[in-house]
């Protein structure tokens, strides 16, 4: 555990400091820090369009009533959990992060998830994750039950086609599996083959109700938790950017269409986590502003041209994207580009003031993104917007990464302390009970951190 603590301290000192400082707090008290601070100055742009878009999308994918619940949540507290990959949250870190964030919510639990990740990412969106082995063996080990075909697994979630009922594989049909996959057939039927899921036209839209259905399966109404709303952040952000390109004073329009500002952004954040690393010879890591999407739905890393008036694909010399409003709007509509993580936070947090709860890495990189944007604006003489952005932002304590919910570990030596539970593990154990939920709410942060360290 000491080495794990040192690992977090070396890579995410802000996250570990936040956990340690809040050690004596209950998780419920700690979660209060995920809420927006109404006393802060207003950001450069109002968030009305973000709230309206999220509520309308929720009404379309879930129900009009849930759309109104999400609207009430965001209007009373402009916050969202942004740590997860878009899919079904079987992963222990994502599922338990959802539970912790839910402690800060009243009407709905807003998840704005990253869809610009391939289908074979760590969250395993094409199947179920079950706990396996012990945390000491590796940082996180799980057994994967493939529910959907493996084709297109390198394609991005945001542009992945919808699956059909015939493509859903029941766990009992998989060879060489122990007994519990047969019990999981009921969970798969309730989540993957639900009519609301199968009527959606894209995997992106299927993942939203699937996550809510899993939430309902694992968490009974008696626990009195708000409903879960899971939306693709890249899709939401793309719609906002398209509108911002038509607004002369919007931050994103200036960032995308003003080459000196784009160049200053490149310099300010070059080499930072979740941004990009590159030089005149090329791009070594990340992408600049957008991800390109190739003909197979896979990601293309983009670098700026020398004049910062276009973006060029690193792996495809013939792929070029002029940075003008008409071309960008069309490319977003046709899903030939997806907003990067940086551009997402520039659009919703820097410009509109959305408070984003995230994981241990976001605790470090989001404040650096905000500082980088402000540095670039001041470099270009835009001191006023930089001051407003800096004044409206306060770092959010880390959310995803604590694993307070433990279940027995029959296949390893952790029978006393248990193993971090994912959604399927908890479902197999009978689901969340009101008593367990209250116990979680009153657990201490330092105890949850100690239980989580073997997984890092």
Where are the predicted features?
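Histidine-anchored nucleotide/phosphate-binding helix
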Residues: 91-108
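Short active-site loop/helix that positions an aromatic residue
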Residues: 363-377
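Glycine- and acidic
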Residues: 78-87, 194-201, 347-357
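Charge-dense polyanion-binding interfaces
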Residues: 379-411
């Amino acid at each position: 555990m000491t080495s794990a603590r040192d690992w977090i301290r070396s890579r995410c000192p802000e996250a570990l400091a936040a956990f340690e400082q809040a050690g004596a707090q209950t998780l419920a008290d700690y979660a209060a820090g995920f809420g927006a601070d109404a006393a802060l100055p207003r950001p450069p742009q109002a968030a009305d369009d973000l709230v309206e878009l999220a509520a309308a999308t929720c009404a379309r994918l879930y129900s009009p009533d849930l759309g109104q619940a999400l609207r009430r949540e965001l209007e009373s507290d402009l916050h969202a959990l942004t740590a997860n990959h878009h899919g079904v949250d079987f992963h222990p870190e994502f599922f338990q992060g959802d539970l912790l964030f839910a402690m800060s919510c009243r009407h709905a639990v807003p998840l704005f998830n990253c869809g610009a990740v391939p289908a074979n990412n760590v969250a395993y969106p094409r199947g179920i994750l079950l706990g396996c082995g012990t945390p000491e063996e590796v940082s996180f080990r799980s057994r994967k039950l493939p529910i959907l075909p493996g084709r297109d697994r390198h394609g991005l979630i945001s542009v992945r086609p919808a699956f059909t009922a015939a493509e859903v594989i029941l766990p009992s049909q998989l060879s060489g599996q122990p007994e519990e996959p047969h019990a999981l057939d009921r969970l798969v039927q309730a989540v993957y083959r639900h009519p609301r899921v199968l009527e959606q036209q894209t995997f992106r839209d299927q993942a939203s109700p699937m996550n809510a259905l899993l939430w309902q399966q694992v968490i009974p109404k008696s626990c009195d938790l708000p409903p879960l709303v899971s939306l693709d952040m890249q899709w939401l952000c793309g719609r906002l950017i398209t509108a911002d390109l038509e607004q002369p004073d919007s931050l994103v329009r200036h960032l995308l269409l003003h080459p000196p500002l784009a160049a200053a952004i490149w310099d300010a954040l070059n080499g930072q986590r979740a941004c990009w690393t590159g030089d005149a010879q090329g791009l070594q890591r990340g992408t600049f502003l957008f991800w390109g999407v190739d003909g197979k739905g896979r990601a293309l890393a983009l670098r700026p041209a020398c004049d910062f008036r276009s973006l060029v694909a690193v792996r495809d010399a013939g792929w070029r994207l002029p940075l003008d409003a008409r071309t960008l709007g069309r490319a977003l509509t046709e899903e030939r580009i997806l907003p990067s993580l940086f551009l997402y936070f520039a659009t919703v947090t820097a410009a509109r003031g959305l408070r984003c709860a995230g994981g241990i890495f976001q605790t470090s990189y989001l404040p650096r993104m905000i500082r980088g944007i402000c540095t670039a604006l001041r470099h270009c003489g835009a001191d006023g917007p930089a001051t407003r952005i800096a004044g409206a932002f306060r770092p959010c304590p880390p959310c995803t990464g604590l694993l307070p919910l433990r279940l027995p570990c029959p296949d390893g030596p952790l029978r006393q302390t248990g193993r971090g539970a994912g959604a399927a593990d908890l479902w197999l154990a009978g689901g969340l009970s009101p008593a367990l939920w209250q116990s979680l709410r009153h657990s201490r942060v330092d105890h949850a951190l100690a239980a989580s360290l073997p997984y890092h």
